[in-house]
């Protein structure tokens, strides 16, 4: 989404077929055991939020930017949320982190330092995305422009552009936090890295292009940071590797050059992700609640099945939301949508399945400004509120009784 302007870790990796099984020893870092996330030797499930705005907001020390970040994290923690997904990029123009290739704003980096530090204080783990597919916050188009090129898809193939991206990855992962004194790659507050928010490619050979890019960049991230988990940033669209699965795509189409199955089978990718936006994906059914409900159930169910049986890695729903800008919106409809997603997550978790949690789009602390994309959620106290639904989900996941942790086989 977004189309708007000290602990030490030891992993025992086993390669079985295409799948890496990670068994985490006692540590502050989250690891993976088969289709489950583990933390300090115990299974962990996630309930959280997106807040792409945190880094740039925290960089604005002249106003109350950092207080806004603190308020959001405090409110999230109060309802039991334990993970946040944020941007670790902003190229080019408004409050840029990366002003030009290799040139960074120290003030904006200090904003990210603060977010990482403050999230740790509230026991909230961070998923940090490293670049945007879209033009907002720069994205791959800005990288291509820096190389003097015109076609955004060259982001995935041009050697100079790929080096720009690798340089950014290294700069972020090896950043020494000015507050904690710890490099990001050594900080257990970070849950995982995300290669790119919602990758897409229109080239006629797009599926091969994206597969090759993910392999290369995932290997590069792991060469720098073996502590943290890694995911791609996929929305979950099926590709041509298993043609019969494309019926689950919105409209049954093959979309965007991504392939949920083959992309997530890359060994250096630790878990799979999906997004869910029935209002925008199914505009003709935007006012037909029953049809949207059917799509949501089928969409999540198909991906859980594939992560359980084919990919054999955890599944995290990293974006879902319902916008007030679509016809027929009401708080009641949004709450029913959230509850539907939460119920599927909980049912999978309770059964020991691969769906490990959900991260809604998006948490904000006020009703004004550029953050108002229609999806914003405010932590209003009281019964029958979205905040109460979130709190209930956090409690249900936290109170699950798990069997003793065993090492899973990928067979």
UniProtKB/Swiss-Prot annotation:
<feature type="binding site">
    <location>
        <position position="197"/>
    </location>
    <ligand>
        <name>substrate</name>
    </ligand>
</feature>
<keyword id="KW-0732">Signal</keyword>
<feature type="active site" description="Proton donor">
    <location>
        <position position="198"/>
    </location>
</feature>
<dbReference type="InterPro" id="IPR017853">
    <property type="entry name" value="Glycoside_hydrolase_SF"/>
</dbReference>
<feature type="active site" description="Nucleophile">
    <location>
        <position position="319"/>
    </location>
</feature>
<feature type="glycosylation site" description="N-linked (GlcNAc...) asparagine">
    <location>
        <position position="33"/>
    </location>
</feature>
<dbReference type="Pfam" id="PF00150">
    <property type="entry name" value="Cellulase"/>
</dbReference>
<keyword id="KW-0378">Hydrolase</keyword>
<feature type="signal peptide">
    <location>
        <begin position="1"/>
        <end position="17"/>
    </location>
</feature>
<dbReference type="InterPro" id="IPR001547">
    <property type="entry name" value="Glyco_hydro_5"/>
</dbReference>
<feature type="binding site">
    <location>
        <position position="87"/>
    </location>
    <ligand>
        <name>substrate</name>
    </ligand>
</feature>
<protein>
    <recommendedName>
        <fullName>Mannan endo-1,4-beta-mannosidase 1</fullName>
        <ecNumber>3.2.1.78</ecNumber>
    </recommendedName>
</protein>
<dbReference type="GO" id="GO:0016985">
    <property type="term" value="F:mannan endo-1,4-beta-mannosidase activity"/>
</dbReference>
<feature type="glycosylation site" description="N-linked (GlcNAc...) asparagine">
    <location>
        <position position="384"/>
    </location>
</feature>
<keyword id="KW-0326">Glycosidase</keyword>
<feature type="glycosylation site" description="N-linked (GlcNAc...) asparagine">
    <location>
        <position position="366"/>
    </location>
</feature>
<keyword id="KW-0964">Secreted</keyword>
<dbReference type="InterPro" id="IPR045053">
    <property type="entry name" value="MAN-like"/>
</dbReference>
<feature type="binding site">
    <location>
        <position position="361"/>
    </location>
    <ligand>
        <name>substrate</name>
    </ligand>
</feature>
<keyword id="KW-0325">Glycoprotein</keyword>
<feature type="binding site">
    <location>
        <position position="277"/>
    </location>
    <ligand>
        <name>substrate</name>
    </ligand>
</feature>
<comment type="similarity">
    <text>Belongs to the glycosyl hydrolase 5 (cellulase A) family.</text>
</comment>
<feature type="glycosylation site" description="N-linked (GlcNAc...) asparagine">
    <location>
        <position position="202"/>
    </location>
</feature>
<dbReference type="GO" id="GO:0000272">
    <property type="term" value="P:polysaccharide catabolic process"/>
</dbReference>
<dbReference type="GO" id="GO:0005576">
    <property type="term" value="C:extracellular region"/>
</dbReference>
């Amino acid at each position: 989404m977004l189309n708007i302007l000290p602990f030490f870790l030891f992993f025992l990796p086993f390669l079985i077929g295409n799948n890496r099984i990670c068994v985490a020893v006692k540590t502050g870092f989250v690891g993976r055991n088969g289709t489950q996330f583990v933390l300090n030797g115990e299974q962990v499930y996630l309930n959280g939020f997106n807040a792409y705005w945190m880094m740039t907001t925290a960089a604005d020390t002249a106003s109350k930017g950092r207080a806004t970040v603190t308020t959001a994290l405090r409110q999230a923690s109060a309802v039991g949320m334990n993970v946040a997904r944020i941007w670790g990029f902003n190229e080019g123009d408004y409050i840029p982190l990366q002003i030009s290739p290799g040139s960074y704003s120290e003030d904006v980096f200090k904003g990210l330092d603060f977010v990482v530090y403050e999230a740790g204080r509230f026991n909230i783990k961070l998923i940090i995305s490293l670049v945007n597919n879209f033009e907002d916050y720069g994205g791959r188009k800005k990288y291509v422009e820096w190389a003097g090129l015109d076609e955004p898809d060259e982001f995935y193939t041009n050697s100079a552009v790929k080096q720009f991206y690798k340089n950014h990855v290294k700069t972020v992962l090896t950043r020494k936090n000015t507050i904690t004194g710890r490099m990001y790659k050594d900080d257990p507050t970070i849950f995982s890295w995300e290669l790119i928010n919602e990758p897409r490619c229109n080239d006629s050979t797009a599926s091969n292009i994206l597969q090759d890019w993910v392999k290369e960049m995932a290997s590069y991230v792991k060469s720098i940071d073996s502590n943290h988990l890694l995911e791609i940033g996929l929305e979950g669209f099926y590709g041509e590797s298993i043609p019969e699965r494309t019926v689950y795509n919105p409209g049954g189409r093959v979309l965007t050059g991504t392939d949920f199955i083959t992309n997530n089978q890359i060994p250096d990718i630790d878990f799979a992700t999906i997004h869910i936006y029935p209002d925008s994906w199914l505009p003709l059914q935007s006012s037909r609640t029953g049809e949207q409900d059917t799509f949501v159930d089928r969409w999540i169910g198909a991906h859980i099945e594939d992560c359980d049986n084919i990919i054999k890695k955890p599944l995290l729903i990293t974006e879902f939301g319902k916008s007030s800008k679509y016809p027929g919106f009401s708080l009641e409809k949004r709450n029913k949508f959230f509850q539907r997603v939460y119920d599927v997550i909980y049912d999978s978790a309770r059964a020991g399945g691969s769906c490990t949690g959900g991260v809604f789009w998006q948490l904000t602390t006020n009703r004004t400004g550029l953050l108002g994309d229609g999806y914003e959620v405010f932590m209003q106290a009281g019964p029958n509120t979205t905040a109460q639904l979130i709190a209930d989900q956090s409690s249900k996941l936290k109170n699950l009784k798990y069997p003793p942790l065993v090492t899973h086989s990928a067979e």
